[in-house]
């Protein structure tokens, strides 16, 4: 056994220069764990509450309150618990908070402790983090969804769709997938430069130029893929995140960059047009988080053909996912640790999805740190897909580098699933 001896939290900064929580956990055995908590820009209204100070400093975004919750409430209550009992630690956190949305302790405080405990457990047991989280069957390296062109809330430009991603589905292994993605990323930079467009990057490391339309973004990406000798639709597929909740106001979806206001039916028609003309295999948050009727129609339209990922729709919450399953809405869930606040609840959401034929996409947040925890989580759960930005900015690359290290550890036993990740599609 390895008993928790001390837990300490401090205020640090994320990739956007906003305060966030760092937690360090010490045990009597000497095993140590840490965590650096991410935060989102386009956040779902149903996410667990992130505790912020609301004072003048840092525009109200300070996290001293969250750190105090760790240092003065959580820590003293968890001292003496066995760090290898993750579910017991997370249950204690939930009981201590006592609310449905973590508004007492804050999901950022709770998650920091939960992640740090998992790491300390791995160190004590002398096992890789991914094996502690998932067991000896953890061996699948994920397809990266690389967000190489940014819009929406992730960029200061006129592009409405928030993320345009590439997926190297025909790579031989994870390292090969990284090579393909990196080569396409650099080719896209040259394509944009040749057109006299900006090559500055957005929150997630992708380029963020002003463009005439969302289709133009896809055209530039197709050009970049072909420039380095890969075949769109065969070796590389595309994915988009519309983050439609950010576009939704007054029963319409407002695409300001294109000067359009669309109904849910018209948004579905827009996606149909994109899917027919570009090799798009995955659409995330195509409609607003509470537009269940619209989501039902979209699922009926694309079921079995396109991966329909619920991010703001499901917020890594088993209650909302259960409703989606019962109503046959979407076919995939985006997994963000800080949407729910504990490792155990996150694993439960992934397991529920898997049992009901939904895929899981492990995801970062736009406000990231250099903590690569989600890389281990992706392998632990054999999710088959990870979304952690472009291959630029160390807050993104840290996750890719960790996956490279894991792939070396699992040499000879790991698998890169390719199209097998879309096991619920007719492809």
From Swiss-Prot:
Coiled-coil regions listed: none
An MF annotation (GO) of this entry: phosphopyruvate hydratase activity
Cofactor names: Mg(2+)
InterPro entries in the cross-refs: Enolase, Enolase-like_C_sf, Enolase-like_N, Enolase_C, Enolase_CS, Enolase_N
Recorded metabolic or biological pathway in which this protein acts: Carbohydrate degradation; glycolysis; pyruvate from D-glyceraldehyde 3-phosphate: step 4/5
GO cellular component: cell surface; extracellular region; phosphopyruvate hydratase complex
Residues that coordinate or bind Mg(2+): 241, 284, 311
Residues binding (2R)-2-phosphoglycerate, per UniProt: 162, 336, 365-366, 387
Entry's cofactor comment: Binds a second Mg(2+) ion via substrate during catalysis.
Reaction(s) catalysed by this chain's protein: (2R)-2-phosphoglycerate = phosphoenolpyruvate + H2O
GO biological process: one example: glycolytic process
EC identifiers of the protein: 4.2.1.11
One Pfam family per UniProt: Enolase_C
Keywords, in A-Z order: Cytoplasm, Glycolysis, Lyase, Magnesium, Metal-binding, Secreted
Compartments, record wording: Cytoplasm; Secreted; Cell surface
Presence of the UniProt keyword Coiled coil in the record: no
Active site (record annotation): 204 (proton donor), 336 (proton acceptor)
Protein function: Catalyzes the reversible conversion of 2-phosphoglycerate (2-PG) into phosphoenolpyruvate (PEP). It is essential for the degradation of carbohydrates via glycolysis.
Protein family according to the UniProt entry: Belongs to the enolase family.
Protein's name according to its UniProt entry: Enolase
Organism: Natranaerobius thermophilus (strain ATCC BAA-1301 / DSM 18059 / JW/NM-WN-LF)
Species classification: Bacteria, Bacillati, Bacillota, Clostridia, Natranaerobiales
């Amino acid at each position: 056994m390895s008993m928790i001896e001390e837990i300490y939290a401090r205020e640090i900064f994320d990739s956007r220069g906003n305060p966030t929580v760092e937690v360090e956990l010490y045990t009597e055995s000497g095993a140590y764990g840490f965590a650096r908590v991410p935060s989102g820009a386009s956040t779902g209204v149903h996410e667990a509450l992130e505790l912020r100070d609301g004072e003048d400093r840092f525009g109200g975004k300070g996290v001293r309150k969250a750190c105090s919750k760790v240092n003065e409430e959580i820590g003293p209550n968890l001292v003496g618990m066995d760090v290898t009992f993750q579910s017991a630690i997370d249950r204690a956190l939930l009981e201590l908070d006592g609310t449905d949305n973590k508004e007492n302790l804050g999901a950022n405080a709770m998650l920091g402790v939960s992640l740090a405990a998992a790491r300390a457990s791995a160190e004590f047991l002398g096992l890789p983090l991914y094996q502690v989280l998932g067991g000896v069957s953890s061996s699948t390296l994920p397809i990266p969804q690389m967000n190489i062109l940014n819009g929406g809330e992730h960029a200061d430009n006129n592009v409405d769709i928030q993320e345009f991603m590439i997926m190297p589905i025909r790579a031989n292994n994870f390292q090969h997938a990284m090579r393909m993605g990196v080569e396409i990323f650099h080719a896209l930079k040259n394509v944009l430069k040749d057109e006299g467009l900006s090559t500055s990057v957005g929150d997630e490391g992708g380029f963020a130029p002003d463009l005439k339309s969302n289709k133009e973004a896809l055209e530039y990406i197709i050009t970049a893929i072909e420039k380095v000798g890969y075949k769109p639709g065969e070796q590389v597929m595309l994915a988009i995140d519309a983050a439609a909740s950010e576009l939704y106001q007054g029963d319409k979806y407002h695409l300001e960059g294109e000067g359009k206001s669309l109904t849910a039916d018209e948004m579905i028609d827009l996606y149909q047009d994109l899917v027919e003309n570009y090799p798009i295999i995955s659409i995330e948050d195509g409609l607003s988080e509470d537009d269940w009727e619209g989501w039902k129609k979209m699922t009926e339209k694309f079921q079995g053909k396109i991966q329909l990922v619920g991010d703001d729709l499901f917020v890594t919450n088993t209650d909302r996912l259960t409703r989606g399953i019962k109503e046959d809405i979407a076919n995939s869930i985006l997994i963000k640790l800080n949407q729910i606040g504990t490792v155990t609840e996150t694993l439960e959401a992934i397991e529920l999805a898997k049992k009901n034929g939904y895929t899981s996409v492990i995801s970062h947040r736009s406000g990231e740190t250099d903590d690569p925890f989600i890389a281990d989580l992706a392998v632990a759960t054999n999710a088959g897909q990870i979304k952690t930005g472009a291959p630029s900015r160390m807050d993104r690359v840290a996750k890719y580098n960790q996956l490279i290290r894991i792939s070396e550890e699992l040499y000879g036993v790991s698998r890169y699933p390719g199209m097998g990740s879309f096991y619920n599609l007719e492809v």
